[in-house]
């Protein structure tokens, strides 16, 4: 379990089904444009179906047990409000993984998602032993891009037609961090930047709140 104030990340459970489905139901229109979909089968390829909730949890647990994934739900003030998964974990000479997430629209803009991502990045670098974390985001997904912008992720370029999202192959921007870029920890850096941007301006000053470093604004899910 990873905790910072009102934000908690814990392993996803089968008994989360009712709360998970309710959050998804209320956020259908908010989430649909950014959700992964299954492409039509080829004449000789297998026919894939969207998994049930239980099938999804079993798959996530299996991948976690194999060391390839870290699946979490996000709680805010004791309520399930989203999901965050570190997937594609690769060891050997790479020691990397990629992060995907979504969050309830009702808590968007409260710092929940940046805090959750910062918590999991620190966990991956300091406890799990990964060296690099990347987040792939559709260019149109401004709410998600703002998450990595706030956290200071570095933009690395475009992957054309990278993932099948909302019924078609979509381009994604790649954002990344390595352990060397946040020796003091990402959560600590995020707290300082958030405090600085929220502090009152001196009389007579103008301008926008402080934005960390230079990356562009998030993984293919709303935040």
Predicted regions and their residues:
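GNAT-family acyltransferases
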Residues: 1-106, 169-223
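Conserved G/P- and acidic residue-centered "switch" motifs that form tight phosphate/ATP-binding loops
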Residues: 78, 111, 141, 167
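Conserved catalytic-core motifs of GNAT/GCN5-like acyltransferases
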Residues: 136, 154-171
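Conserved acetyl-CoA-binding loop-helix of GNAT-fold acetyltransferases
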Residues: 101-103, 109-123, 142-150
């Amino acid at each position: 379990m990873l905790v910072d104030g009102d934000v908690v990340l814990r392993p996803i459970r089968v008994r989360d089904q009712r709360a998970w489905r309710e959050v998804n139901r209320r956020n259908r229109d908010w989430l649909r444009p950014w959700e992964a979909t299954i492409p039509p089968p080829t004449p000789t390829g297998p026919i894939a179906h969207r998994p049930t909730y239980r099938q999804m949890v079993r798959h996530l647990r299996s991948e976690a047990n194999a060391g390839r994934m870290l699946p979490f739900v996000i709680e805010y003030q004791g309520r399930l409000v989203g999901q965050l998964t570190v997937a594609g974990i690769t060891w050997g000479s790479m020691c990397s993984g990629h992060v995907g997430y979504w969050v309830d629209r009702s808590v968007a803009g409260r710092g929940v998602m940046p805090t959750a991502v910062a918590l999991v990045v620190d966990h991956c670098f300091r406890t799990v032993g990964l060296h690099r974390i990347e987040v792939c985001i559709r260019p149109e997904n401004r709410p998600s891009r703002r998450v990595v912008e706030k956290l200071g992720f570095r933009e690395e370029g475009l992957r054309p037609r990278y993932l099948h999202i909302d019924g078609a192959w979509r381009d994604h921007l790649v954002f990344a961090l390595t352990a060397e870029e946040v020796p003091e920890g990402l959560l600590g850096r995020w707290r300082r930047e958030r405090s600085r941007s929220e502090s009152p301006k001196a009389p007579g000053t103008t301008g926008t709140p402080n934005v960390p470093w230079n990356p562009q604004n998030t993984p293919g899910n709303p935040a």
